[in-house]
Amino acid sequence: MIIEPRMRGFICLTAHPTGCEQNIKNQIAYIKSKGHIEGAKRVLVIGASTGFGLASRITSAFGCDASTIGVFFEKPASQGKTASPGWYNSAAFENEAKKAGLYAKSINGDAFSNDVKQQTINLIKKDLGQIDLIIYSLASPVRLHPTTGVLHRSVLKPIGATFTNKTVDFHSGKVSEISIAPCEGDDIENTVTVMGGEDWSMWIDALKKENLLANNATTIAYSYIGPEVTEAVYRKGTIGKAKDHLEATAFSITDSLADLGGKAYVSVNKALVTQASSAIPVIPLYISLLYKIMKSEGIHEGCIEQMQRLYAQRLYTGNEIPTDDKGRIRIDDWEMRADVQEKVAKLWLEATTETLPEIGDLEGYRSDFHNLFGFGFEGVEYKADTNEMVNVSSII
């Protein structure tokens, strides 16, 4: 079939398998160009199919020559209907890993469930024995709690007062004002249950109980802080409470791994175009201004550049891992530079529908968004008849 982007709001309903494959190849080429990283050799990535999780898997495999197991929840293709991009990404990743002689297997299912944890445990026992590095990179709006059976939904809302600020429809470029009502009832509790650290902790406990964690094993989860302008809806909102919980969980996991010399860290990453961030009001406008500044300064990074820097300059330098005063690894350091934030804050005040094409990088935003779904890559023949029915080789 001829596959074209079909949009509904901030979601693209189609994905292009050849474009997703090109995306993987581009990321692998970048990692290889930066040279070998003396890092983990047996890596589990929970949330391995898109964004930072996918980039972590690529960096582990093609930077460190690691064997990788990836867990994700993606939709395979059906006749005439494309798969989700993460499915095509994972299929392409496994193919490239196989060509390079690297072990790569995947599990498709709900990572919050006991069943998927058990499947993963069985696979590690059978194939790898133990794990050196566990990356936890889940972004889900819902979580079916494995113990209580309750379905929890996360919300992106401010706490205490309505938040009003600018936002942009990144398809049309229209800048408008948006008001978001504050959370109520169980909103905070539900958001913490979905996006906090409980499931991360459950994964580590399950792996440790089965003796699947190597000595000095490391686990990393990802977080975001961001600027003042997004604070009310992000870091000081419901999602911020979940991130606080995630960050606190790193310390309790580290305590539980003391007998193995293991450590848990949260890495604070930069703002990037992902399916998750596109859904958050205010963030797309901030990102389009941030991109403009960071590109002009020569310090712009995508997911793969961020993960390469995390591995090569933070995790695996041979020295102690540098952290901030709250024990977090910071690779949002270039985004949060005072000069960058000052410039973004100034542009924020000037941003209108008319000025944004000039002062922001809406084109860069749109391009990155299309790339998430396998569209807009050089060297891909988008007018060609494409087979949507692609398998992930390790998943029957």
UniProtKB/Swiss-Prot annotation:
Its catalytic activity? a 2,3-saturated acyl-[ACP] + NAD(+) = a (2E)-enoyl-[ACP] + NADH + H(+)
List all disulphide bridges recorded for this chain: none
What the entry lists under InterPro entries is as follows: Eno_Rdtase_FAD-bd_dom (IPR024906), Enoyl-CoA_Rdtase_cat_dom (IPR024910), FabV-like_NADH_b (IPR050048), Trans-2-enoyl-CoA_reductase (IPR010758)
Q: What is its EC number?
A: 1.3.1.9
Which parts of the sequence bind substrate? Answer: Y224
Instruction: Identify the residue position(s) of the site Plays an important role in discriminating NADH against NADPH.
Output: E74
**A GO BP entry:** fatty acid biosynthetic process
This protein's pathway: Lipid metabolism; fatty acid biosynthesis
Mention one GO molecular function.
Answer: NAD binding
Question: EC class of this enzyme?
Answer: oxidoreductase
The superkingdom of the source organism is: Bacteria
Return any one Pfam family short name. Answer: Eno-Rase_NADH_b
Active site location: Y234 (proton donor)
Positions of NAD(+) binding: 47-52, 73-74, 110-111, 138-139, 243, 272-274
Q: Which UniProt keywords apply?
A: Fatty acid biosynthesis, Fatty acid metabolism, Lipid biosynthesis, Lipid metabolism, NAD, Oxidoreductase
Functional note = Involved in the final reduction of the elongation cycle of fatty acid synthesis (FAS II). Catalyzes the reduction of a carbon-carbon double bond in an enoyl moiety that is covalently linked to an acyl carrier protein (ACP).
Task: Report quaternary structure and partners.
Answer: Monomer.
Q: Which family does it belong to?
A: Belongs to the TER reductase family.
Q: What is this protein called?
A: Enoyl-[acyl-carrier-protein] reductase [NADH]
